[in-house]
Regions:
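Non-catalytic, solvent-exposed segments at the cell envelope interface
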Residues: 2-28, 35-347
Length: 347
């Protein structure tokens, strides 16, 4: 009996079929593990891609390059650089979070259009209450598609970082016929004294009486120099009890922008270069995709560009009272003519 058992054991050890089965089983296990790893990686990559940027979701393609309007063909001026500026209604450090939504709202929005071919700069002021398509996300960053609401919320629905910035860029691009808007500068309320100081303080003419009760010296038509104590109110204050009070704030922002650009044009290039280096002190309050080299190139263009108060344009349209908030509705025909005038040339 014992001898028989030993023969069976020897036969089992030398049986190639058993070895083959073991090898096959191991290969199957490895294949399953590999498949699972690949599947998990793909799902994670898909998830991340949905969370990275609105710019990845919205591809402008080439459709904007050539358009036809009222029978006339137009070609996009490829020597234009577009930079979006937005001031958001928050204080403290600007930083992204893993949870999307409920972020700051873009209170002031402007597109800087630098036309190197015609040596001019235009600033297109965009009402924050403009009703247009913006991108929404779930709380964990999944893309929910486009939704029509106030353009200022394009930043709010993102992550408070790059996604928010690029969502706002996308909203402006969609509003303006898919023109490319890739560069941006976003600041919050705590940045204002630093921005003012970069230009050595700004002196301007007050355009309205909105602030006269708090600042008697700020009567319409008065010349004032803004300092740390007044800059935030001048650029941000509005009477929330009054309908369309954002219009008065936009008038003050326009006056400030005009004076600021004129001051920068009067500075020499060395001082403007130092201004970039000084931005380090406001790192916590600024988000930008503009590199140092791009900034220096823009500075040179700025020095040569034609710029007056008339170089600041406002989005054409009308104010309306909405169910919850004021709304600004664009005049589509006037907007199309503005787009052609700013960005296109006849073929």
């Amino acid at each position: 009996m014992e001898r028989a058992l030993r023969r069976m054991e020897k036969k089992r050890r030398n049986n190639p079929v058993n070895k083959k089965q073991i090898i096959i089983s191991l290969m199957i296990c490895l294949a399953v593990a590999l498949f699972a790893a690949v599947f998990i990686h793909i799902e994670q990559t898909k998830q991340r891609s949905m969370q990275i940027t609105a710019g990845n979701t919205h591809n402008v393609g080439n459709s904007y390059r050539n358009i036809v309007y009222k029978g006339q063909e137009y070609q996009y001026n490829n020597r234009i650089t577009n930079i979006l500026y937005a001031g958001v209604d928050s204080t403290g450090k600007l930083e992204a979070s893993s949870q999307y939504g409920n972020k700051a709202r873009a209170d002031s929005i402007a597109l800087v259009v630098m036309d190197e071919k015609n040596r001019k700069m235009t600033i297109l002021s965009i009402n924050r209450d403009t009703m247009t398509d913006i991108r929404r996300y779930t709380m964990n960053g999944n893309d929910k598609g486009l939704y029509t609401t106030h353009i200022g919320y394009a930043y709010s629905y993102g992550d408070g970082g790059k996604v928010s910035c690029e969502s706002l860029c996308e909203a402006v691009s969609l509003l303006l016929g898919d023109i490319p808007v890739k560069r941006y500068v976003v600041t919050n309320q705590d940045s204002m004294p630093y921005i003012n100081e970069l230009a050595g303080g700004i002196t301007l003419t007050v355009p309205n009486n909105d602030l006269q009760e708090k600042y008697p010296e700020m009567a319409e038509g008065a010349q004032v120099t803004l300092d740390d104590s007044s800059i935030k109110d001048f650029l941000q204050y509005r009477d929330t009890e009054e309908s369309f009070s954002n219009e008065g704030r936009m008038q003050r922002q326009k006056a400030y922008l005009t004076a600021y650009v004129e001051k920068m044009q009067s500075m020499d290039e060395n001082d403007l270069e130092k201004a970039w280096d000084s931005l380090e002190v406001m790192d916590d309050y600024i988000q930008t995709s503009v590199t140092r080299n791009q900034y220096l190139g823009l500075v040179k263009s700025l020095k040569k560009a034609e710029f007056t108060e008339d170089s600041i344009e406002q989005l054409p349209g009308t104010d309306q009272e909405g169910d919850l908030h004021d709304e600004f509705h664009v005049d589509e025909e006037a907007l199309q003519e503005l787009i052609i005038r700013l960005f296109y040339e006849k073929v």
